[in-house]
């Protein structure tokens, strides 16, 4: 496991931009999934509080969790789909506590607002492992570990790519008008990707970020906001969309506005997640670059739990390697 997860983000080698395709497994997700209770008392009971099923990436993420925590692997899984509501996740965690599960796995919708319920889990002696997104708490002993992507680094890499792209186009001195479709407000993916890109953008004297708007990580909202931005601004050069689902909607809006996107298009498109459909659009030239965020995280959390079961010391944070297309 240790060879797959980086313990220190600063030790990562320079990112190589290569074509990759994510294999997205999945089927329609119910709001709650629970393994049939087994008579075997030796099964490890894991309660999972998932964000929702708002995107193709999230569906693949859920599938990776369900694949890892099977009865065949020694687990009983209690799964809760919060439908993008933090209150639902808090309710689910309290339900897991009352059921006396062995471990709680949380992919938090927002960073803040977790101190009380995580303290309740700690008082009950139930370790909490964070997956994908992070929390902001006063006491970091309220969770055992976290595994996911470095969202700040993802945002930075998007900015560095754009800087290099403009130089290769001979346009490094041109004014560049940028709009940003942000994800769910308060989510660590949104916060990190925004911060990382802005760090690069602020030192570019000719980059103008016209607006940064909330696209909620959904295709419908991405299209709605992009259409509004196109009505408001006639000279958009670049759209930075913080996930592929919003990008799909933005591309629809761009086409309906009579403009073109991607390689040799009117608008340069930077996307995140690199789901299969996003990769295909890169190959077709409609998306210029897609920054990968690996959804296959369930197996890493399962390994953390196995290490804890074996009494091994675990790290506080595990970063997945970055690969872009």
Model-derived features: positions:
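Hinge/cleft segment of the Venus flytrap/periplasmic-binding protein
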Residues: 11-14, 25-44, 180-185, 200-201, ...
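Hydrophobic alpha-helical
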Residues: 106-123, 197, 211-280
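Short beta-strand elements at the ligand-binding edges of bilobed clamshell
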Residues: 79-81, 137-164, 180, 212, ...
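Short, low-complexity disordered leader/linker segments with a strong preference
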Residues: 1-45, 70-71, 119-126
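Hydrophobic alpha-helical segments within soluble ligand-binding/sensing domains
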Residues: 89, 146-175, 221-223, 274-278, ...
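Flexible loop/hinge segments that line or gate small-molecule binding clefts
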Residues: 116-153, 177, 275-281
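Extracytoplasmic "Venus flytrap"
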Residues: 45-72, 77-91, 95, 99-101, ...
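Short, solvent-exposed amphipathic alpha-helices that sit
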Residues: 57-71, 75, 154-161, 188-207, ...
């Amino acid at each position: 496991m240790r060879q797959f997860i980086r313990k220190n983000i600063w030790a990562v080698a320079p990112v190589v931009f290569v074509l990759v395709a994510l294999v997205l497994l999945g089927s329609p997700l119910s709001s709650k999934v629970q393994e049939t209770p087994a008579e075997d008392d030796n099964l490890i009971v894991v309660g999972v509080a998932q964000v929702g099923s708002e995107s193709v990436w999230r569906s693949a993420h859920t599938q990776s969790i369900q694949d890892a925590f099977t009865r065949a692997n020694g687990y009983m899984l209690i799964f809760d789909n919060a439908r993008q509501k933090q209150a639902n996740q808090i309710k689910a965690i309290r339900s897991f506590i009352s059921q006396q599960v062995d471990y709680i796995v949380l992919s938090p919708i927002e960073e803040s607002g977790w101190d009380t319920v995580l303290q309740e889990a700690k008082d009950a002696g139930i370790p909490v492992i964070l997956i994908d997104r992070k929390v902001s708490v006063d006491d970091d002993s309220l969770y055992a570990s976290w595994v996911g992507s470095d969202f700040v680094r993802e945002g930075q890499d998007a900015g560095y790519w754009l800087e290099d792209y403009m130089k290769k186009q001979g346009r490094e001195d041109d004014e560049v008008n940028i709009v940003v479709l942000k994800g769910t407000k308060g989510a660590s993916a949104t916060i990190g990707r925004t911060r990382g890109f802005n760090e690069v953008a602020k030192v570019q004297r000719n980059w103008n970020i016209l607006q940064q708007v909330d696209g909620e990580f959904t295709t419908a909202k991405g299209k709605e906001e992009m259409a509004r931005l196109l009505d408001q601004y006639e000279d958009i050069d670049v759209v930075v969309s913080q996930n592929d689902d919003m990008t799909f909607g933005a591309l629809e809006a761009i086409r309906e506005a009579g403009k073109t996107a991607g390689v040799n298009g009117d608008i340069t498109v930077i996307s995140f997640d690199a789901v299969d459909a996003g990769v295909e659009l890169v190959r077709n030239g409609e998306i210029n670059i897609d920054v990968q965020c690996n959804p296959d995280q369930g197996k890493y959390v399962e390994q953390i739990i196995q290490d804890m079961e074996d009494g091994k010391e675990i790290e506080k944070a595990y970063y997945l390697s970055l690969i872009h297309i």
